[in-house]
Every structure is written in C-alpha cells, then in structure tokens.
Amino acid sequence: MPRLRPKPNATPDDLAFGINPCAMALSAGLVRSLSYLEETKNRRVFDLVDRAREEGIAVQAVTGPRLDELTAFGVHQGILVRLKTIEPVDLAQVAREAATASLVLLLDRVTDPQNLGAVLRTAVAVGVDAVVLPPRRGVLLTPGVHRASSGISFVAPVATPQNLAMAIRTLKDAGYWIVAADAGEGSTSATEFDWPARTALIMGSEGEGVGQLLLRESDFHVALPMDPRVESLNVGVACGALSYLWRRRWPLAPRSD
C-alpha cells in the first residue's frame, strides 16, 4: 500500500516552492536563497538557478528527500526559495493616491490558501488597488497561497491593517463606498447595482459570509443572481465575478505604451 504524504501545511512562511512561484519571487526581487533538486533535468529549473546566480543569490543543490522535508512533501517541482520580508502596502497612502475609479478588496475570515490565491490573481488581473487581509481573521501570505496564485502573491498589493473596521474607516475617509457581498434578503443584484467609482468590496468566507458588524458598516449589500439549486459560490469565484462587474462599469484607461 503506498505511503500517504502529508499535506504541505507545516512549511515556514518565508518559503516558496514550485517553478512559477519561484520565478515570480525572483522577478519581484524577494529571494534570499535558492535550493534545487541536485538530479533535476528540468530546463526551467536550470534557468532559475542561472538567474539567481547572476543576481548574487546563494544557490544550493539538495537531495530529493531533503527538498521533500523542507516543503513538507509539497509539490515543489525540484525548486525552493527562501524569501525576504514581503512588505505590505500602506492602505491610507493607497487610498489617498488612487485614481478616481478605484477598487479595494477586504477579506473577512477567508482561511483557505487556495481561495486567497485565486483572489490575489483576480485582484492583479482586474487592477485592484489593495487587498486587505486582517492579521487575525484569515490566512495571510503562506507557501500555499504563493503556489495557489502561481506567484502573483509577490506582486499583489496586500495591506494588513490591525482590523477590518479600521480599514473601513480609512477608506470611508478617502471617499470609498463600502459594498458587502451578502446573499441575505434585501441585497441588490450585483448585475443591476450601480457600482460607485470608489468601491471597497468586502468578501466573506463561503461558510460564514461577511460578519454582522461589517455588514452594518457597509453602505450597500450586493448578491450575485444564481440558480436556487446553488447555495453559494467559492469566494474566489464570487470575488472574480463581482470585481469584473465593477471593472465593466469603470474600465481601465488605455495603456499609453
């Protein structure tokens, strides 16, 4: 009977593994050191090793068992990096300097790394100005999030204020309207909602939704219209749909280049 491997949930937060996350970490200038599988024949791994050496980053070849141990048997594809500190963005500064049309995402009790990874990919694709992650009410940037986002987590504008109530006050002071995703009675259909130019969108976990305190702090509640046989959507999927509804109302300015 094959031995079951433990899930990669015991790795330190200053690690990333897998080809795409490691490549993004290198591009973002966040790599302190790199380890790779000594018997690898993967050309993409060799390319990343060469890049790291050219940038003066410490590189080490390790055995397969050692790489498995370092990643807690995660799907590492033969490469792992240790990270520098990922500095959060200053939410107040972002709010002050954002364009007239600006979207900020606030995540309440989102604990699944896969969901956060999906949200961060959506955020960068849509052009969100900040993703607010409260330190005590959900998952932060972990190896699982880096892998789920294919490394987009290294370039996503993540803010980590003390709590979401404080973040909401900061955003309201900067002219944002607070919109909560809520499937409860009285919510406006998200497809018919007139999205404000400056929107702070609160997303809750699939199981619990947005907390009551945050719902009371919100200016509007919106819900995605769905077939009644579907009780709820994954927060990553719902966030993508709502973010693009906002972007449809407030398109990105054409690139000058």
Where do the PLM segments sit?
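N-terminal positively charged helical leader segments and presequences
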Residues: 1-96, 255-257
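Structured adenosyl-cofactor binding patch, chiefly the S-adenosyl-L-methionine
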Residues: 23, 28, 125, 144-152, ...
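RNA substrate-binding interface of SAM-dependent RNA methyltransferases
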Residues: 23, 30, 40, 47, ...
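Short, hinge-like loop/turn segments at secondary-structure boundaries
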Residues: 77-80, 147-152, 196-199
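Short glycine-enriched loops at secondary-structure junctions
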Residues: 85-87, 136-138, 207
